[in-house]
């Protein structure tokens, strides 16, 4: 309050009633959008021409006592060039908009998306799994007078200091950010990070590869993040 005297404003894209559909196309969560036809295991309630945000990767990871486990599948249909939420599939039950259980299921799906994007993909995979080894290798392998090492040295040192802080403040230990803010204890967070590092492929960040692999090449909806 001392630094920022006004609360953050809600982006206009997220003021619509169908927040899940807006996030699926106009936020970093669009990274998880895919055609339901690409799912290896597709629940009966999910049609092949649907689009999904599949967070079943959290299945099998127990939540902390008193917490509900994040996860589920956001199911969206293409209608008149836009995505609209059909429901959230969770633990064998399809929760439709307007049903008493839909809001809870949607929140748990959003919790899963947020946990995966921040703790697993951003911090563990990118900061620690990719950027840190690149910085260390560049510093250790190239000679001190190499032009590339000299050019990158200030950025690499800042990267290593920052990622050291990421590891200790956000991931390592039971009092770290990932274990206190989100739904899983430290041991479970470590197990999820191991799986995320083993399964991630950096090629998925290439737009052409990603749209083909996720069945989005001919998607009948506008995908601003991929276009950008």
Which sequence ranges carry the predicted segments?
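Long, compositionally biased charged/polar stretches
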Residues: 1-228
């Amino acid at each position: 309050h001392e630094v920022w005297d006004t609360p953050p404003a809600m982006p206009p894209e997220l003021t619509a009633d169908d927040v899940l559909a807006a996030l699926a196309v106009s936020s970093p969560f669009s990274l998880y959008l895919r055609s339901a036809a690409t799912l290896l295991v597709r629940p009966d309630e999910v049609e092949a021409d649907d689009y999904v945000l599949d967070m079943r990767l959290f299945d099998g990871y127990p939540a902390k006592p008193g917490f509900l486990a994040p996860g589920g599948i956001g199911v969206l249909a293409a209608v008149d060039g836009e995505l609209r939420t059909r429901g959230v599939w969770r633990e064998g039950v399809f929760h439709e908009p307007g049903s008493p259980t839909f809001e809870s299921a949607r929140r748990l799906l959003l919790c899963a998306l947020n946990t995966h994007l921040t703790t697993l993909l951003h911090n563990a995979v990118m900061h620690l799994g990719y950027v840190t080894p690149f910085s260390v290798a560049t510093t250790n392998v190239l000679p001190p007078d190499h032009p590339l090492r000299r050019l990158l040295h200030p950025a690499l040192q800042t990267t290593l200091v920052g990622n050291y802080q990421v590891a200790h403040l956000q991931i390592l230990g039971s009092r770290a950010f990932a274990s206190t803010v989100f739904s899983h204890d430290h041991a479970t967070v470590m197990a999820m990070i191991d799986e995320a590092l083993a399964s991630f492929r950096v090629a998925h960040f290439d737009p052409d590869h990603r749209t083909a692999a996720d069945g989005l090449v001919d998607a009948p909806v506008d995908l601003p993040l991929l276009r950008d």
